[in-house]
Every structure is written in C-alpha cells, then in structure tokens.
UniProtKB/Swiss-Prot annotation:
Functional summary from the UniProt entry: An accessory protein needed during the final step in the assembly of 30S ribosomal subunit, possibly for assembly of the head region. Essential for efficient processing of 16S rRNA. May be needed both before and after RbfA during the maturation of 16S rRNA. It has affinity for free ribosomal 30S subunits but not for 70S ribosomes.
GO molecular function: ribosome binding
Record-level GO cellular component terms: cytoplasm; ribosome
Swiss-Prot/TrEMBL keywords: Chaperone, Cytoplasm, Ribosome biogenesis, rRNA processing
GO biological process: ribosomal small subunit biogenesis; rRNA processing
Family: Belongs to the RimM family.
Gene3D superfamilies associated with the record: PRC-barrel domain (2.30.30.240), RimM (2.40.30.60)
Protein name from the UniProt record: Ribosome maturation factor RimM
Subcellular location: Cytoplasm
The protein's assembly and partners: Binds ribosomal protein uS19.
Amino acid sequence: MKVPEDLVLVGYISGAYGLNGWVRVRPYSADADALLNAKTWWLDKPEFRDVAMMQSKIHSGDVVAQLMGVAGRDAAEALKGATVQIPRSHFPALSDNEFYWVDLIGLEVENLQGVRLGQVSDMMDNGAHPILRVAVPQTSEADPKAAQELLIPFVEQFVITIDQTAKKITVDWGLDY
C-alpha cells in the first residue's frame, strides 16, 4: 500500500449510522465537499489503511457514509474514533477568497495596528459563522488572568486580509476585545 504524501486530516468517525454498516463522520470544516467527493478515505483504526467510500451524504451537519468492507452496525461502531484523511489532490477547487480551514491553521494573526495577536490553532463553527481560534503567545511573566486564546469571527467585518504566501492574517481586532 502506497500512502499518498499529501494526506490531510478532514474529520473523525463519531459512530455508526443505522444498522447497515454506515458511519457518521464529524468533519473538521464547515464545507464537507472534500469528504463527499473523495472515493478513497484513509483511516487510522484498527490500523492505518485506505478504504473505498461507496456513497455518502450530509445528515444533521455530519457526513454519513457507506465504506467498502464495513458490514453491519458492530463493524461501523468499531471504527468510532478513527481519523479520516484524504489526499489534498482530491479536494475540490476553490474560488477566489475561499480557503480550506486546514490552510489557515498555523498562520500568524495581527491586527490593523501591526500588533501580533498569535497563531491560528484551530477553526470552529458556531452555527452562524466560522471562528478563528488564535493561540495567544505568553510572555515570561505571564499573567495567569491573561487570555490564552482569542476567538475571532471569521467574517469580512473582522478578517481584512489573508496572505497565505506570507502566512499572515490581518484582522480588525483590538487587544481589549
């Protein structure tokens, strides 16, 4: 088995769906197109392997899918907790000003005044819009009451520019927010 070099973690199996071996996947993105369109998923449970994805659909914000060789609820439940990876080359093309969340993680965040706020550690969806989770750098005399993390809405009002080449996001966000 040749493992693709461009695998990207896109979600995890949260449990079984129904009685016929379907699995429920919690995507790590608001847009699950990559999961829905990939014909092969790479799972890390019970061992790292590729599995053919036979069919899938969105259900209550998750992806439910039928995987080759997973027959029955018990087999699907045994995959609970497995991470799902797919090759980056299988991701659908994006339009201008669209980004995959995985590409934003690790970018530096600074405000319009040029103050470094931290680094994107994760993204989450609050139902209304995505949110940048920014890990705040701690000084040597760290104030125990100081914020460890900033939550910045990922909307045009606050996110001014995203420069993937410079690995930087500029936001309209004050230090006192």
